[in-house]
Amino acid sequence: LVGQGDEVIVVDPAYDSYDPAVRLAGARCVHVPLLPPSFRFDWDRVREAVTPRTRMIIVNSPQNPSCTVLSRDDLRELARLADEHDLYVLSDEVYEHLVYDGAVHCSVLSEPGLAARSLAVFSYGKSLHATGLRVGYCIAPAPLTTELRRVHQFNTFTIATALQHAVAAYLAEKPDVFATLAPFFTAKRRLLTEGLAGSVLRILPSAGTYFTLVDYSASEMLGTLDDTQAASVLLESVGVASIPLAP
């Protein structure tokens, strides 16, 4: 789908495996920042990043790590952009069931202008609290899955048969499990928010995923540090592990 000299638009911050995968294909990522505190897509900025070499845009909703969720209007903007420039869309939807506060996950597969040019990726590992399983799937039109199959065997060969049977058996036993995920993680988010209430750390809104962003600018210990430095200090000084937004 992409090759030597092609460009792929990726928003920042983003899951750190996108960039290496693009570079392995001989293409390069063009990074478009999502700005705090909302981290919403700025479609004008995305359009400015498109060049004659652009072949694909990668989107992730709910988004790791900004915790934002693309709206139906966002998907329509994406559809217009992809149609105007004949772009493929790789949609990372592994957190599809982890949306909160009335937010709704909108898949690219549900948008008529996107379904024919998109690959949507899903994960049972994320949905079933077992990321080590590495069990997932991709939905795309036949011409795109043909290209996917050309490389899939050499990337993963296959998913362990026992794990596939385990997931199938679990879903047959608990067909309503996905409906329990949002309340489960909402309770976890509330516990973290209440634990940090009254501290100098400010929780930013989290509409989806199992991540939460923290504004530490008011902290005397951390306020002057960048995110990587702050993560190191938190770990070494107080034994709290965090993940910086910087790649």
Show which residues each predicted segment covers.
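PLP-dependent class I/II
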Residues: 1-247
